[in-house]
A protein has these predicted regions:
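Alpha-helical transmembrane segments of integral membrane proteins
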Residues: 8-15, 19, 32, 60, ...
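Transmembrane-helix signature of polytopic, lipid-linked glycan biosynthesis machinery
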Residues: 24, 213-228
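Hydrophobic/aromatic-rich transmembrane helices and adjacent perimembrane loops
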Residues: 32, 227-249
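Membrane-interface alpha helices of multi-pass inner-membrane proteins
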Residues: 3-27, 38, 217
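Perimembrane helix-loop-helix junctions
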Residues: 2, 9, 33-74, 95-97
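Aromatic-rich transmembrane-lumenal/periplasmic boundary elements in polytopic membrane proteins
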Residues: 62, 68-69, 73, 77-150
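Membrane-interface anchor segments at the N-terminal boundary of transmembrane helices
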Residues: 137-140, 149-206
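Structural signal for the C-terminal ends of transmembrane alpha-helices
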Residues: 1, 39-50, 193-202, 248-252
Length: 252
């Protein structure tokens, strides 16, 4: 079998598609993670066919692995994502719900009216959020996140003597969203070590974690003037934790 086997339906990819659709239903920037992880799995399939010496391993992997992977992850994910809009579809007066009816001949005409309205809703939301730029005391740019340059304030009060347990002239009460400095500052050398291990030892585990971290972090640099906050970094923090654990594991 010079072209190698066809893996058919891979349930773990199907499950990944379900999770992907649910993730995008919560936060759109999940798309970057899904793209990175999906491409990684196809790359691993390509490399596996190359290692066993199959004929035209790159082309066959794209056809026999890449196309099924697309439908199992992206196709399934799209259906799950649309299901998160069930309430919007069932409504008759939701925001943008009647856009296609009120704007005949406009938008993506090959889509059914319901989906055309939903698409325009997405376009409008994307334009608003990607261009959102307004001064905010606790805003922080992406380059500040790893060094905890500007935590996000969730609560602040200045009670005076005799109120809220304050026993001096003036007190401060604050709740800040800030990571553990010992862990977050350790992420930076961990990233550098992981890059060196990847380059020198070709350790795919660090490569995978770096790719997924990059997918969650670097897209934010495309919007240098957008109002952003430190808590945006929480989406890729789990992968940095795994990266740090992997680097510490090198010493064991």
């Amino acid at each position: 079998m010079p072209w190698g086997p066809s893996m058919g339906l891979r349930l773990w990819r199907f499950a990944a598609g379900v999770c992907a659709g649910a993730a995008v239903g919560v936060k759109w920037n999940s798309l970057f993670f899904i793209a990175a992880m999906g491409l990684l799995t196809v790359f691993w399939d390509i490399n596996a066919r190359r290692i066993v010496g199959l004929h035209k391993w790159g082309l066959t992997a794209l056809v026999r692995d890449g196309i099924p992977a697309f439908f199992q992850m992206i196709g399934v994910g799209l259906l799950v994502y649309l299901s998160t809009w069930a309430g919007w579809f069932q409504s008759s007066n939701a925001y943008f719900r009647r856009w296609a009816v009120e704007n005949p001949g406009k938008g993506v005409m090959w889509l059914p009216e319901d989906l055309r309205s939903l698409w325009e809703y997405h376009v409008s939301a994307f334009k608003f959020h990607s261009g959102l730029s307004s001064p905010h005391t606790y805003s922080s740019q992406a380059w500040q996140w790893l060094v905890l340059g500007r935590p996000t304030s969730y609560y602040y009060e200045s009670p005076k003597l005799g109120s809220s347990g304050c026993t001096v002239k003036s007190c401060s009460e604050a709740i800040l969203n800030i990571g553990n400095p010992a862990i977050w500052w350790a992420f930076i050398p961990a990233i550098i070590v992981a890059l060196l291990v990847l380059l020198l030892k070709r350790d795919w585990r660090f490569g995978a974690l770096l790719v997924v971290f990059g997918a969650g972090y670097f897209p934010w640099f495309m919007y240098p003037t957008r109002t952003m906050f430190y808590f945006y970094a929480l989406s890729f923090e789990p992968f940095l934790i795994l990266l740090l654990a992997g680097v510490l594991g090198l010493a064991l």
